[in-house]
């Protein structure tokens, strides 16, 4: 029975963070489109560096911390509301705020196919990592597993964006994703033990790219 529950949890986690799950993440690049336009990301090597830096030290790291905290406090509505408010405040640009809130809303809407009381404990609108953290926690999925798959989903989407932007091909894109495995597992392990005191980023160029994307005339992505 324990094995069945673990398999069920794995299936749910895979479904929720699959590219096929209807959250619309394909529409966002998180500033990567601007970075490509500005010549900051030009090939597979620089794409891998960009993604790895954001996971370890940028906005994606903050998302991982928020996910872990929401996972930890999924049974406490007051704490979830506080974490959700903090997640909104940490959005560094209008597009970044729009992205995390719309993804969170779409995730919660789709995840209601698996009924649980956590949906009543969360705010009506919650940032994406807060939504994912609370729902995975409520369904008994371990924080490190949830974080690893969440980070891998981000990396996979970023690689897909890089391919669509023409900085790498599919074969090199797969190699980028494979090369990020060690980074993802290390950050997932670190984030699982994190607290809100560990929030913080040091990716100024990425933050500026996110802001500059708001005035970009020609674009494929919404962020």
Curated annotation (Swiss-Prot):
This is Urease accessory protein UreF. HAMAP family: UreF. Keywords: Chaperone, Cytoplasm, Nickel insertion. Signal peptide: none annotated. It comes from Rhizobium leguminosarum bv. trifolii (strain WSM2304). GO terms for molecular function: nickel cation binding. It is found in: Cytoplasm. InterPro entries: UreF, UreF_sf. UreD, UreF and UreG form a complex that acts as a GTP-hydrolysis-dependent molecular chaperone, activating the urease apoprotein by helping to assemble the nickel containing metallocenter of UreC. The UreE protein probably delivers the nickel. Its main location: cytoplasm. Required for maturation of urease via the functional incorporation of the urease nickel metallocenter. One of its GO terms (cellular component) is cytoplasm. It comes from the Bacteria.
């Amino acid at each position: 029975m324990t094995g069945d529950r673990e398999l069920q949890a794995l299936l749910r986690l895979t479904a929720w963070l699959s590219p096929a799950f209807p959250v619309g993440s394909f529409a966002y690049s998180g500033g990567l489109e601007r970075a490509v336009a500005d010549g900051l990301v030009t090939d597979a090597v620089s794409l891998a560096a960009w993604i790895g830096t954001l996971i370890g030290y940028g906005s994606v790291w903050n998302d991982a911390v928020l996910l872990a905290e929401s996972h930890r406090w999924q049974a406490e509505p007051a704490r979830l509301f506080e974490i959700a408010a903090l997640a909104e405040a940490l959005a560094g640009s209008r597009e970044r705020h729009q992205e995390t809130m719309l993804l969170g809303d779409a995730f919660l809407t789709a995840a209601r196919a698996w009924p649980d009381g956590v949906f009543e404990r969360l705010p009506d609108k919650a940032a994406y990592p807060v939504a994912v953290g609370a729902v995975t926690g409520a369904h008994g999925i371990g924080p490190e597993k949830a974080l690893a798959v969440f980070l891998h989903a981000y990396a996979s989407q970023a690689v897909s964006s890089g391919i669509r932007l023409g900085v790498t091909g599919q074969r090199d894109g797969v190699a980028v994703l494979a090369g990020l495995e060690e980074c993802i597992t290390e950050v997932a392990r670190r984030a699982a033990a994190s607290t809100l005191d560990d929030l913080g980023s040091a990716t100024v160029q990425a933050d500026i790219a996110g802001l500059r994307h708001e005035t970009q005339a020609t674009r494929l992505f919404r962020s």
